Amino acid sequence: ASTIIFKSMKDIRKTQAKAIKNPTGGHYDYGRQGTSTTYILQKILTKLEESYHVFTTPTGFGAVFLAIFSVTRPGDEIIAADPVYSPTRLLTENFLKEFNIKTTFYNPHDLKTLEKSITKKTKLIFVENPGSNSFDFQDIGKILSIAKKHKVLTAIDNTWGTPYFLKPIKLGFDCLL
């Protein structure tokens, strides 16, 4: 629902002023910015994932886009697991190039190649565990060690793992999808 009903223009303006001062404070004036339902969902997911905060997006592609674009700028590089979710590959192989952001893919069973792929421009290692297309499991502990050693941020798509089986934030990942 994108329309939120108010009794008067005065009420809308009050709510909008509060939302500007505190964007996550539960002041709803338009559904795209969140509703009581989305904020409750975010609070529940934050507890399930045992994380600091959760943002919901309308699609998985939106979540991947947000995770990557929040830490990269033109000229940066990311490294992604080869068997990523096909829309993630679409994003990395097509859209990131438009922004001069390079993606290198690594074999999830060859972490030496992953480490050799890291450059001074590498900002993110993007992991899926298990991999969407192949269900490959990776040594995420080793990946985290490599990332920390090189001071590279990490993101993991945990769609298949869910917080029931895996809690990536507790393990040390910087971002969870």
Indicate residue ranges for each PLM-predicted region.
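Glycine-rich beta-alpha junction loops
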Residues: 2-7
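Short, solvent-exposed polar/charged micro-motifs at secondary-structure junctions
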Residues: 9-12, 114-116
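Conserved N-terminal alpha-helix of the aminotransferase class I/II PLP-enzyme fold
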Residues: 10-62, 89-94
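Conserved PLP-enzyme active-site core in the AAT-like
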Residues: 54-177
